[in-house]
């Protein structure tokens, strides 16, 4: 009893934010090896699984559904059956999704009970309002874009989604043609979840594809938004390495953690000494971070020795880190070698196959490939060679070319993309590579798809060079603070 004689009651307001319907909503396809592909997608961040199977006989559908249900229960993932109330009952599913006109949600509620999840497909505001009035737990809204899985009669689009979001209180699952590259627009319009099929299950690496889409939801998180772990050497001068990484991550609005691989005695004039951190202690640091702190993106820089690279690769594999940005730091601005001679081959063999993105500059790409790079065409060829080493994406930075704009080239295995900025003549460029790569990692962690993350990071590093102030008697650092303010104001 309270002192005034009134009983205190705990009142819980259950709104859409308490719903399990959020994030990446996976709808199954009809292809082979479904169970391992769905499990990989769950590893990558799928939060809900809908079982859709209209091709097999009932016995086969039931057997496969039981396998999926057990997988989802082991992983604490809601398991929803598509358009088959009897099947949902037989499988003891967590819920049922009904197409528009494919069943009565009130009858489904009566049969399944109040604790089950019921969703309905909608295409218009009136259908959405009707579904909410019928007591469903969420609506599916689509199609957002043309889809490969079926013929699209209604393209709802982001504008209708935004209008419906302001009119209903239950979660909205956007569906239809959603990919890594267009998913952000429907999340920004108000989708609580995005439903995908082929964008994940037809991908050669469903876990990575799921991670790419799941990360897009970080764009709605409060600041610090997203988490970046930098694995790199320390710069006592503060312009590069761990120091530059953490400045960038923090100033751009994410949470930064760090693992030190080496200590350097360094200033604007160069590196006078390097003390490598024992590989076992590098592994201990990685264990400490990964076992406790959520990490969305890992960024690596100076790794120093082959033994350290082996230790890092082992931990990235153990903890199933997929979003890894590898900046293959080899030489300091002043010319000092920052990696052992034998470590380069280990870097290519052990770390590149784990990389989501590698970001070499031209001298680094030449050392990694043995090619001579003198123009954009030779940059493209070098990017192809680097991609064949196993990295998912290669961003070859063209700042070392002497003429014209500063052009960076992204190769994703299928197409090239150019990122262009004016060339700025300045000797205050210490830490540019570290800063650029950590900015890309930060924007990825904040929910930007890859090309947008690179474009935003390119604007940031260009501003950091343009706004740099002289410091010391050598190559001064870029201006992290004013650059962050500059890109924030745009």
From Swiss-Prot:
<comment type="pathway">
    <text>Cofactor biosynthesis; thiamine diphosphate biosynthesis; 4-amino-2-methyl-5-diphosphomethylpyrimidine from 5-amino-1-(5-phospho-D-ribosyl)imidazole: step 3/3.</text>
</comment>
<protein>
    <recommendedName>
        <fullName>Thiamine biosynthesis bifunctional protein ThiED</fullName>
        <ecNumber>2.5.1.3</ecNumber>
        <ecNumber>2.7.1.49</ecNumber>
        <ecNumber>2.7.4.7</ecNumber>
    </recommendedName>
</protein>
<dbReference type="InterPro" id="IPR029056">
    <property type="entry name" value="Ribokinase-like"/>
</dbReference>
<feature type="binding site">
    <location>
        <position position="121"/>
    </location>
    <ligand>
        <name>4-amino-2-methyl-5-(diphosphooxymethyl)pyrimidine</name>
    </ligand>
</feature>
<dbReference type="GO" id="GO:0004789">
    <property type="term" value="F:thiamine-phosphate diphosphorylase activity"/>
</dbReference>
<comment type="function">
    <text>Condenses 4-methyl-5-(beta-hydroxyethyl)thiazole monophosphate (THZ-P) and 2-methyl-4-amino-5-hydroxymethyl pyrimidine pyrophosphate (HMP-PP) to form thiamine monophosphate (TMP).</text>
</comment>
<dbReference type="GO" id="GO:0008972">
    <property type="term" value="F:phosphomethylpyrimidine kinase activity"/>
</dbReference>
<feature type="binding site">
    <location>
        <position position="177"/>
    </location>
    <ligand>
        <name>2-[(2R,5Z)-2-carboxy-4-methylthiazol-5(2H)-ylidene]ethyl phosphate</name>
    </ligand>
</feature>
<feature type="binding site">
    <location>
        <position position="82"/>
    </location>
    <ligand>
        <name>4-amino-2-methyl-5-(diphosphooxymethyl)pyrimidine</name>
    </ligand>
</feature>
<dbReference type="InterPro" id="IPR034291">
    <property type="entry name" value="TMP_synthase"/>
</dbReference>
<dbReference type="Pfam" id="PF08543">
    <property type="entry name" value="Phos_pyr_kin"/>
</dbReference>
<feature type="binding site">
    <location>
        <begin position="50"/>
        <end position="54"/>
    </location>
    <ligand>
        <name>4-amino-2-methyl-5-(diphosphooxymethyl)pyrimidine</name>
    </ligand>
</feature>
<keyword id="KW-0547">Nucleotide-binding</keyword>
<keyword id="KW-0418">Kinase</keyword>
<dbReference type="GO" id="GO:0005829">
    <property type="term" value="C:cytosol"/>
</dbReference>
<keyword id="KW-0784">Thiamine biosynthesis</keyword>
<feature type="binding site">
    <location>
        <position position="102"/>
    </location>
    <ligand>
        <name>Mg(2+)</name>
    </ligand>
</feature>
<dbReference type="InterPro" id="IPR022998">
    <property type="entry name" value="ThiamineP_synth_TenI"/>
</dbReference>
<comment type="function">
    <text>Catalyzes the phosphorylation of hydroxymethylpyrimidine phosphate (HMP-P) to HMP-PP, and of HMP to HMP-P.</text>
</comment>
<comment type="pathway">
    <text>Cofactor biosynthesis; thiamine diphosphate biosynthesis; thiamine phosphate from 4-amino-2-methyl-5-diphosphomethylpyrimidine and 4-methyl-5-(2-phosphoethyl)-thiazole: step 1/1.</text>
</comment>
<dbReference type="Pfam" id="PF02581">
    <property type="entry name" value="TMP-TENI"/>
</dbReference>
<dbReference type="InterPro" id="IPR013749">
    <property type="entry name" value="PM/HMP-P_kinase-1"/>
</dbReference>
<keyword id="KW-0808">Transferase</keyword>
<feature type="binding site">
    <location>
        <position position="83"/>
    </location>
    <ligand>
        <name>Mg(2+)</name>
    </ligand>
</feature>
<keyword id="KW-0067">ATP-binding</keyword>
<dbReference type="GO" id="GO:0008902">
    <property type="term" value="F:hydroxymethylpyrimidine kinase activity"/>
</dbReference>
<keyword id="KW-0511">Multifunctional enzyme</keyword>
<dbReference type="GO" id="GO:0005524">
    <property type="term" value="F:ATP binding"/>
</dbReference>
<keyword id="KW-0479">Metal-binding</keyword>
<dbReference type="GO" id="GO:0009228">
    <property type="term" value="P:thiamine biosynthetic process"/>
</dbReference>
<dbReference type="InterPro" id="IPR013785">
    <property type="entry name" value="Aldolase_TIM"/>
</dbReference>
<feature type="region of interest" description="Hydroxymethylpyrimidine/phosphomethylpyrimidine kinase">
    <location>
        <begin position="229"/>
        <end position="490"/>
    </location>
</feature>
<keyword id="KW-0460">Magnesium</keyword>
<feature type="binding site">
    <location>
        <position position="150"/>
    </location>
    <ligand>
        <name>4-amino-2-methyl-5-(diphosphooxymethyl)pyrimidine</name>
    </ligand>
</feature>
<dbReference type="GO" id="GO:0000287">
    <property type="term" value="F:magnesium ion binding"/>
</dbReference>
<dbReference type="InterPro" id="IPR004399">
    <property type="entry name" value="HMP/HMP-P_kinase_dom"/>
</dbReference>
<comment type="similarity">
    <text>In the N-terminal section; belongs to the thiamine-phosphate synthase family.</text>
</comment>
<feature type="binding site">
    <location>
        <begin position="147"/>
        <end position="149"/>
    </location>
    <ligand>
        <name>2-[(2R,5Z)-2-carboxy-4-methylthiazol-5(2H)-ylidene]ethyl phosphate</name>
    </ligand>
</feature>
<comment type="similarity">
    <text>In the C-terminal section; belongs to the ThiD family.</text>
</comment>
<feature type="region of interest" description="Thiamine-phosphate synthase">
    <location>
        <begin position="1"/>
        <end position="213"/>
    </location>
</feature>
<dbReference type="InterPro" id="IPR036206">
    <property type="entry name" value="ThiamineP_synth_sf"/>
</dbReference>
<feature type="binding site">
    <location>
        <position position="266"/>
    </location>
    <ligand>
        <name>4-amino-5-hydroxymethyl-2-methylpyrimidine</name>
    </ligand>
</feature>
